[in-house]
Amino acid sequence: MTTVRLHLRRIMCNSSRAQTAQHTEEERKRTIISLQGGKSFGRATTNDVIFLDGTEHVELEPQFISRCHARVHHTNQDGVEEYLVEDISENGTYINDRRLSKDKREILKSGDTIKFGHKNGSQHVADQKYDHPDADFAFCVEMSTAGEPAYQLVEQIRDSRVKVFAGTACAKDIGPREPSTTNKVLQQEADSTNGGPEMENNRASSASSATPEDTQMPSTSQYFCSIPKKTPFRKEFDSPLHNYIYRTSRHSPLYRKKLAEQAQRMAVKNGTFVNDSGVIELLSHLLDINVAYENLVTKNEKLEIIGTFCEKNKGSFKVDELSRRKEELAVMMEEEEPQTIEIRELLVSLSEKAQDVQSNDFTISASSAFTVISTSGVLCPTASLANESEDSYIQHLKSINISSEKSRKIADELKTVRNSEVAPIENKPLSPEMMVVLHRLVKAKEHNNKVAHVYTGNYASTVSRVMEMVPITSQVAVITTAGTPKHTSKGSAETAPMEVDDERHSASSGSTENNYRRRTDSEESEILDVVGTDEPDKDEKGGTETETPTPSPEDHGRQTQNKIDKNVRMSSTPRIDAQSTPSAVVSALPTPMNSPLPRVTSSKSAQDVSTPSTTPNPVSRSPDPVALVKDSVSSESTVSGIVSLEKIGSPAAQSVASVLPSVSNTTSSTSASLTTSSVAEEEETSSKENTDQKRAVDDSSDESARLVKQIKALSATPSSTPAESSKRKQKDTSSRKMKQLDESSADSDSEDDGRSGDKSTKRRDKARRSTRIGKSTPAKKVGKKEKVVEDEDETDDVQEEEKVTPRGGRRKNMKRTASQSAIKERKTKDKDVEPEEAPKKKRGRKKATPTEEEEPPKTEPSKERCGVAKGHCISAKYEKRKNLQWVSCSICNQWFHVWCVRLDNVCYREDETFLCCGSHPSKEAKDALAGRVYARYQAMPNKKPIPQASEA
């Protein structure tokens, strides 16, 4: 019987790619792929035929090819060879454009066309035909008989592994396959399914012994085997995914997150346990096991995985929910197989990263309670304290085992001691049990700094458990011990507790009344320390004052030598006597902020205070502050009659006003302590000095009145010559000062006249105001001149003064009236000029001639036309409505819509490269230019997505 063998020859369906006929004879041999012994197809490197996108120089993973896409099983029975195709992919395997079923095997025949992958393969139905003229990986099944060159070539390359590229028809040989027992099991499974002889030796059967490998049954592939159908097999000994060597990577947060997302997605599809967190968590564990089984992809295989999981976890929480919905879960797990493949690849990548990192040996800390046995390398626990044995530690724990009655008593004593810290009472002695507990707590704190926390933690927990209360968290030193008896030495004397003066130890300026009172006491004590007393103090009535001075560091030794009564007053700061306080020292003290405004006794005193500033006499300009203080103290109107000093404008008066607040405060505080005899003597002495002072003040007031008259005469006489006007300009500054003096003297005169004087001063002020404005230059605004006229109409006296003005004033009035008349003439001329009438609008429907506007310069558009062909561009209709993102090629600067490139309106990052030309173009650019992105967009069954606004 003639032996017939089948093989695959690569055909190029895409017209834009190179054709098979263009190759030489040697290259045509490279387009043949042998099917002897069975083959596996996919994009994973473990397959016999590896599909790659691009060319031999650029290797990229294809988009519509699975890791393990399909298998071809080869059987040989009675000299008849059969080739069966099995589809295990998501995007389908097609024979003569008919989609294969996943659970069936199709027999290959000579002349069939087999295509791997389709852009819409995930949505195609089995046993239905779908045209795919531009398939990247298409092959024609050819037959060869013995004696033909192709027959010998197929026999030569039966064990080789090749790479097939989408851009070229020639396959690249990457070396022979390695034989393995796993492939023999797969071959035996294929033979037994088709009625072939079964192999006796199997890796799963323990009774059979291994036999030498059959040279006529070579290994077929490097993929992981399925569970055998007709041989005994125990699933608990199964080692999926390399015995799960990636078990460390399974605990990665990224891997767990992907599993949780897949479980949540399946729960949403099911709809029954969306909000049941227990079922979702159990489902994530099931999916974790599903990742390990790489080759179990069909529905029946998924049902087997779910059944085994439910059986192993029988009795767990919510397992019955999964077992009742096994059929639905199997269908969803089959649909989620592409996502499962991505999760599996993530697990492999995480494990590869973990293998690169070299693990360091475990190092034990110095305070560890474990030691390493050199022989076995196992950590064994040892005692923390090497000097103490285990028996001593047990005896120590027994020694602190206090009874419940004593522990309650200790708790009460602790509470009493803590309360004693708040209330100032005498310290109470502690019981012996309490002292033992405190001593051991101190020892525990000392051990805490020396030994490991294992020993200290046991110790502290035992103490807290014995005492039946919350452990003490504060410092142990807070709990006081028994009090000591009070003894005093014979040579030492008791000292009274004294309050610290707040003013000396604070930065306050006396903002409250209490601070002000304490301030006065401290000020008086400071005066006592600096000045001292002229006469010995006398006891006052009532006995409230004491002779104890304010203690200082220098007087501390002197203070301890004298005994002080027990019933001494708490505030030891003494009051000051009026006779022992010089007024000059009192006036130099700072004035509190809350002290009242000082007042003057009468109008005469106001004149006496204000006149020294106006008199040229230096003696009267700086009066003696002692005399002023005595005058204010001796007069009876110091308490009753008060007149404000707000109108005192002279500098000397302000300096006197700064002196008076402290004088008024000190005199008010000392007046209560003065005796009647001292007051009488003070009045006699002060009255004599007052008379002398008043005479000097009267003389100075007469001289000031003369100066005021001279100033008025000088201001009233006009300058008739230019020389005199220049002199007047030179004396402007001096006249301003004299006018201020004039106002101050007029205010002082108004105090003597009373109410009638107030009215006259108002008129004088108005008259002065009007004359000053009249002397201003004519370059000022007219509004001020109108105000002057209104002021002239107010009072008759002002009008009379203006009539009697000298010749210079008349000239200015004439100039003012002339300027006003000129302004009126200008206004009338403006009114006489008639404004030009605007042209009337013509009625009718005739359009007005448009004005010629300059055309703006034409600007080039920022973005050009999309580099994708017009028929494949899916973003043109969204350019006006959506804010589309663009990307340009780094070589030719050709612009592309990001939506046309990868169906996502997210800008490229700076570290990402985009190339549409050159030797290494980007995969996304090639897909967009080849129309794959457009085809994928059109193949979407549901509503097409719309580009969303990109977040900048």
From Swiss-Prot:
The lineage of its organism: Eukaryota, Metazoa, Ecdysozoa, Nematoda, Chromadorea. It comes from Caenorhabditis elegans. Keywords: Nucleus, Transcription, Transcription regulation. Residues 761-772 have a biased composition (Basic residues). Residues 523-537, 789-800 have a biased composition (Acidic residues). InterPro entries: FHA_dom, SMAD_FHA_dom_sf, TCF19, Znf_RING/FYVE/PHD. Residues 553-568, 685-706, 725-742, 823-832, 856-866 have a biased composition (Basic and acidic residues). The keyword Transcription applies. This is Germ layers disorganized gldi-3. It is found in: Nucleus.
